């Protein structure tokens, strides 16, 4: 991984009054470019081949310029060119997925957030250690598939967007569906309502919901629309579907807005606070936007089954603000909040606290 000291050396040559915000043209890039422009930054979209035509349909979110590469791996060879433009990369889910964790960790361009979180987020065992260490309630883990005696969710390491997940109720079903060439985790299947909670942690803001260092914000929340799980049961009962050779899949195709009962907000903030505080001790803290992927049970317990330590696509619902963000500032998206953090850090000489 590129060192923090190397990144700080790059920053010494930056014109901090002319920073460029860049990301790969995918995932939440429209929101990121829109938010950066609203905060006065120049924007750069990175794409393979011809720039996507759909950006022409959204002029407020179209990047000011494109960096066209032959492959995503070729981005590594463009580091000097990006640094000459005073670029700060905003990582989203596709950036890490397309570049790969090793390339992303080694990319010689200042990046928003703490890249050290990758080690803890991408390994499900370390992720579980982190969350349990924070006192978070998680679904039970099944170490031996022979011990499956009820519904479980099986996840392959690195599975994103709902791909690489399946549900099994018995060892026999598990054996029928498992790909043993991949590392996997078996979790208890929790019944309830899924909520994806979108937070923002600032190490440089010391007002609002303050922590031991910095402050925590709740910007929004969503629920994912999954194919074919959300519609499949129109065809019959689970037993009838299995008998017909049809099994649910969980590929994310979109997102739906949600709000939570106000009485649950103290617990929601407590979850975010504990996760951030634990991260400060483990790897110096995650920075910026993150998402706790949860299930709310009928006893109003919240169980966390995963964390995404960067902007998630569910925040795209709220480019013009959310019911929660509006109570802090109107028209505040997660993309704009990221740009605002960079802007304040640059103006106050604190970029070293939010980039890696």
From Swiss-Prot:
Enzyme Commission number(s) of this protein: 6.3.4.23
Principal EC category: ligase
Known cofactor(s): Mg(2+); Mn(2+)
Matching InterPro entries: ATP-grasp (IPR011761), ATP_grasp_subdomain_1 (IPR013815), IMP_biosynth_PurP (IPR023656), IMP_biosynth_PurP_C (IPR009720), IMP_biosynth_PurP_N (IPR010672), PreATP-grasp_dom_sf (IPR016185)
BP GO annotations: 'de novo' IMP biosynthetic process
Textual note on the cofactor: Binds 1 Mg(2+) or Mn(2+) ion per subunit.
Gene Ontology terms, MF aspect: ATP binding; ligase activity, forming carbon-nitrogen bonds; magnesium ion binding
Annotated positions binding Mg(2+): 293, 306
Domain spans labelled ATP-grasp: 101-333
Top-level taxon of origin: Archaea
Annotated metabolic or biological route of this protein: Purine metabolism; IMP biosynthesis via de novo pathway; 5-formamido-1-(5-phospho-D-ribosyl)imidazole-4-carboxamide from 5-amino-1-(5-phospho-D-ribosyl)imidazole-4-carboxamide (formate route): step 1/1
HAMAP family cross-referenced by the UniProt entry: IMP_biosynth_PurP (MF_01163)
Family affiliation: Belongs to the phosphohexose mutase family.
Role, per record: Catalyzes the ATP- and formate-dependent formylation of 5-aminoimidazole-4-carboxamide-1-beta-d-ribofuranosyl 5'-monophosphate (AICAR) to 5-formaminoimidazole-4-carboxamide-1-beta-d-ribofuranosyl 5'-monophosphate (FAICAR) in the absence of folates.
Name of the molecule in the record: 5-formaminoimidazole-4-carboxamide-1-(beta)-D-ribofuranosyl 5'-monophosphate synthetase
Organism, as annotated: Methanosarcina barkeri (strain Fusaro / DSM 804)
Chain's gene name: purP
